[in-house]
């Protein structure tokens, strides 16, 4: 269901009271006996809201202490790089974390400009720090760095988030996050006895070092993006940071590489009063959502396109991207991934390792599969979650990793790792490179792909379920699917493991020649998600979705 106010400008009633949100961060103490108030530390870290007693000072004290203990056990002896985004709760949590880290004797690197720090910038800082003298990546030995990013990503303004990046620079694997969460919950009830150094004292200590995140990241971008072709073409790129952490990075790119990137909306406002409402009636800073981006698109259609050839967007921590093209609007992330893959693997990155694959999540469009087959590139299909790309990117087994929720990263031009977390800045820059090199914008190139590979229709539907049903998903096997056809086509695969790495997908994927669906339970809500795609017709997609529910119900024994 799309909310009635989706795509409408935010009203005063939609805005948070920043003082209340920050005040409750400090004043409200969670009860460890209430499940909703405990630490839940997934691959995107711990997320919650001070208004719901799920993101408060106690949580951050306990989580940071757990991280300090974990890195000590793991032998991580180098600095910890810490950054924050523009959410109201991010600065208080950032300060709390520094107090605990310094009390634990951890060397902490903070931004020398006292600026916001995008997620990919922290990843890139960790990876370059951990690079050996011969240019290879180290993940064992003395002096290795790790990091923390304080962000709930594109979540609403009420929310806070706190995630840990180990020495591989990307989302921590489940065994690490589970250990941190378990220890944090042990500490939560007694958080006041955890040692801290008051912030003003901590930042003056020798343990807190200033690091120019912005300079370090931006100067290195020329090793990932072809700025020469962008500059010589005169492509006019606009960027909407959506009030997020990338806002001050684009002007430095102009300065360093003699570009003319225009920051469309440079304001930072923790209420995000300038946004249009997302599909569910909330303010959500998602650069791939046509509803959240409607204000920008309307202004472009009302004359602003005279200034730009294309516009890119990033979310609050700049790990997600959005691409907006004239006469098209916001591109579907699946479509943009397919365009990127054909461009990058089609001769424009000759320094990439031979045989390095294209990484995609199993709920991303099969258009990517068709493009990969046409250029004879290896496809590596993994479960949902960018954490599955960390090791393959780190080791150069994939040169590109992308997911349907507008997250991607790819290797440097010389084939070495760039980031192992999602990077929302380089896809925006790549869109300008692609336009400059091909003479067509990504939407036009997508239309060319549709002419060659066929048009597809894609949809995600959420279905209510129970905790008992959710538990059954993990135990499914292909044998639990008794159907032989889906939407009139013979079933060609019944998957409960991802073909690219044989990891359990926590659900089910069923494919035919021109259709597929995947079903998996939500990690945070009592719903299961069904993703589906058809290369036949919109009506066939509806049929796939209808039959998917029957297949899932029967497989679960309902």
Predicted regions and their residues:
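Flexible hinge/switch segments at interdomain interfaces of large molecular machines
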Residues: 33-43, 195-198, 263-270, 523-524
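Metallocofactor- and cofactor-centric catalytic cores in central/energy metabolism, strongly enriched
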Residues: 57, 116, 121, 516-518
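Ferredoxin-reductase
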Residues: 2-15, 75-172, 369
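Short beta-strand segments
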Residues: 83, 147-153, 313-316, 401, ...
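An N-terminal, well-structured beta->alpha segment
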Residues: 2-103, 128, 199, 207-237, ...
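Phosphate-binding chemistry for phosphorylated carbohydrates and sugar-nucleotides
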Residues: 12-15, 20-27, 107-123, 131-132, ...
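Catalytic-core signal marking the mid-to-C-terminal active-site face
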Residues: 440-558
